[in-house]
């Protein structure tokens, strides 16, 4: 009798589990989107808005930096002009000393000319660095603008995704809605390509700047520690 009751209890448990499994099979939660097919993932609007603010801030900083580098570039150009005039004056003085057979003075002027020419190389290297800094800040500003445009497109795409028409599948309204989503997705991706291109240009400008700074260091060392 005990064995029969135990078998009956097991049978009841199996029946209940089978019923629950059947119900779960019929009442399923919506499947999550296939991540392999999601080209542009849905993101919180707050995240996109925050990134737009960051991009604008980046652009403002780049524009402000460019103004400073422009001032330094113009100052470097002025210094080069003054140094070139100084060299011309020294060369004239050397020439006059040679004509007057003042060998010691001519030799002294020759040394001054070499020193001034070495300093001129430093100033020209500084100018190249300033010009490269301007180019980097311009590239940063262009990148920030492209990022803001791409995020704006993504923002419009997400807003469109969240406002589908209350129309059956295959209806004209639904077809127009899907076409609009596709267009926004395409324009968003195109703008993201532009962002990637701007990043590449910025990287090139930064590499050029680093190279010019190295040349400036070499020129400064040659001036301060002549062989």
Sequence positions of predicted segments:
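Bacterial N-terminal signal peptides
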Residues: 10-20
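Intrinsically disordered, low-complexity peptide-like regions
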Residues: 4, 19-22
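Extended amphipathic alpha-helical heptad-repeat regions
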Residues: 31-227
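Bacterial N-terminal signal peptides that target proteins for export
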Residues: 1-10
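Boundary at the C-terminal end of the N-terminal hydrophobic targeting segment
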Residues: 23-27
């Amino acid at each position: 009798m005990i064995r029969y009751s135990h078998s009956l209890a097991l049978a009841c448990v199996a029946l209940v589990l089978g019923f629950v499994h059947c119900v779960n099979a019929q009442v399923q939660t919506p499947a999550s989107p296939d991540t392999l097919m999601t080209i542009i993932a849905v993101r919180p609007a707050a995240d996109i808005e925050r990134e737009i603010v960051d991009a604008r801030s980046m652009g403002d900083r780049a524009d402000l930096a460019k103004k400073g580098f422009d001032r330094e570039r113009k100052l470097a150009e002025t210094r080069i002009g003054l140094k070139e005039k100084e060299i011309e004056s020294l060369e004239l003085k050397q020439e006059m000393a040679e004509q007057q057979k003042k060998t010691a003075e001519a030799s002294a002027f020759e040394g001054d000319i070499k020193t001034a020419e070495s300093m001129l190389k430093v100033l020209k290297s500084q100018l190249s660095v300033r010009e490269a800094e301007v180019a980097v800040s311009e590239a940063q500003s262009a990148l920030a603008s492209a990022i803001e445009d791409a995020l704006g497109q993504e923002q419009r795409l997400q807003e469109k995704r969240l406002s589908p028409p209350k129309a059956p599948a295959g209806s004209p309204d639904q077809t127009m809605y899907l076409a609009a989503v596709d267009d926004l997705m395409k324009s968003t991706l195109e703008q993201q390509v532009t962002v990637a291109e701007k990043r590449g240009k910025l990287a090139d400008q930064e590499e050029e700047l680093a190279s010019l700074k190295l040349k400036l260091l070499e020129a400064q060392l040659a001036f301060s520690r002549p062989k």
